[in-house]
């Protein structure tokens, strides 16, 4: 049987069987070392060759913090540490051959009671980052101060220097109740109200740092790298950097991206879609037009003669980055121009076709905008999806 079956002593850089005092000292040292604001971690992040390497270092830091807290949940407790060192209980290869005091001990083996509990993870801390469409195209780096709840290192999350085991739950934090119904017996674990699930009670004065609360508020600066091409709803996760609970894996800090709408552009997949003014003579004869990209660059675009005005311009690889770099799609607004331009154009255009056969009623016309079609209430939710699909259905690309 291994003397360190889960590697708890190894992660603390201790020899198997080290005392609880040695474990506490090593835990505090390792947690301080792997905190993102520690000199050791700052130096590693500073020397990282790329953003990807920095993200990897932060992820490894969170994983190390989680492993340290898993080790702490066992080796800080004399009873659990004794079982761990001897390979007994949940750390053994199989159930013992007997010795259960009653049915509740058997139930505890199967359900993972407090003395044999599963390692649960604390809920994540989530924040929404709102960026403009331009920022989602070019990317950006933002810094945020995030408050999280950490286990008090002064009292090791016990609330005081001297604590005693809760007599109501025998230190388990939960107790098992039995109910009989129609000849069947059901067993259920209930959080102990005598110790509020902690398994112990404070003797004497509470901890001066946390005032008996067992946890303290911690503020950490997070550098969030928002990469070019990020989509609305994407998540940037810092594993193990969130709230802590004794005996639990620390939670994550998650930043969720929200992208604002833009007055000039919209995103369709990885394509960037916009509008461009094109003089009629350029549309007919070809030429050059100028356009300001969403990233601020000035583009000089060569335009071939239009075969039909139901045509969109496609500039390859000028869209959003991703697994496939998108294109810049521009819907042309054909501009006729001044009176002199109109006269020159009329000289080269062929005469209109003859009046078709039939009886016609004369009416006058004027220019106006297209009205929005009426929609049933049920169709309103489809408006966003339909606008993107209808755009591409009405234009051909070349």
Swiss-Prot record:
Disulfide bonds: none
Stretches the record annotates as Disordered: 367-386
CXXCXGXG motif repeat residue numbers: 152-159, 166-173, 192-199, 207-214
Cofactor comment: Binds 2 Zn(2+) ions per monomer.
Record-level Gene Ontology MF annotations: Hsp70 protein binding; unfolded protein binding; zinc ion binding
Binding-site residues, Zn(2+) 1: 152, 155, 207, 210
Keyword Coiled coil: no
Zn finger region (CR-type): 139-219
Binding positions for Zn(2+) 2 per the UniProt entry: 166, 169, 192, 195
Quaternary structure note: Homodimer.
Function: Probably involved in mitosomal protein import.
Protein name according to UniProt: Mitochondrial protein import protein mas5
Organism: Encephalitozoon cuniculi (strain GB-M1)
């Amino acid at each position: 049987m291994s003397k360190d079956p889960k590697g708890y002593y190894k992660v603390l850089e201790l020899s198997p069987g080290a005392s609880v005092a040695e474990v506490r000292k090593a835990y505090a040292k390792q947690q301080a070392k792997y905190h993102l604001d520690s000199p050791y971690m700052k130096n590693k992040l500073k020397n990282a060759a790329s953003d990807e390497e920095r993200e990897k270092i932060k992820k490894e830091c969170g994983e190390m913090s989680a492993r340290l807290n898993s080790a702490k949940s066992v080796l800080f407790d004399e009873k659990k540490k004794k079982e761990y060192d001897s390979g007994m209980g949940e750390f053994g290869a199989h159930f013992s051959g007997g010795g259960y005091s009653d049915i509740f001990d058997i139930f505890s083996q199967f359900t993972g009671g407090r003395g044999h509990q599963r390692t649960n993870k604390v809920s994540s801390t989530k924040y929404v980052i709102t960026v403009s469409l331009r920022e989602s195209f070019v990317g950006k780096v933002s810094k945020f101060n995030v408050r999280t709840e950490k286990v008090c290192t002064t009292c090791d999350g016990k609330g005081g220097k001297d604590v005693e085991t809760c007599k109501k739950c025998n230190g388990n934090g939960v107790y098992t109740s039995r109910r009989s119904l129609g000849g069947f017996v059901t067993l259920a674990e209930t959080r102990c109200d005598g110790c509020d699930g902690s398994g112990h009670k404070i003797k004497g004065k509470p901890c001066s740092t946390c005032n008996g609360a067992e946890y303290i508020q911690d503020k950490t600066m997070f550098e969030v790298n928002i990469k070019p091409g990020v989509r609305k709803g994407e998540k940037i996760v810092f594993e193990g950097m969130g709230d802590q609970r004794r005996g639990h894996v620390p939670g994550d800090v998650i930043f969720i991206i929200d992208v604002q709408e833009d007055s000039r552009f919209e995103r369709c997949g990885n394509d960037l879609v916009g509008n461009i003014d094109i003089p009629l003579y350029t549309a007919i004869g070809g030429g050059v037009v100028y356009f300001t990209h969403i990233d601020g660059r000035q583009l000089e675009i060569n335009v071939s003669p239009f075969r039909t005005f139901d045509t969109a311009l496609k500039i390859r690889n000028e869209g959003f980055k991703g697994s496939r770099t998108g294109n810049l799609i521009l819907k042309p607004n054909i501009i006729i121009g001044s009176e002199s331009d109109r006269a020159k154009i009329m000289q080269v255009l062929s005469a209109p076709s003859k009046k078709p056969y039939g009886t016609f009623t004369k009416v006058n016309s004027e220019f106006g905008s297209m009205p929005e079609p009426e929609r049933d209430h049920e169709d309103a939710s489809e408006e966003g999806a339909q606008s993107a699909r209808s755009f591409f259905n009405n234009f051909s690309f070349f």
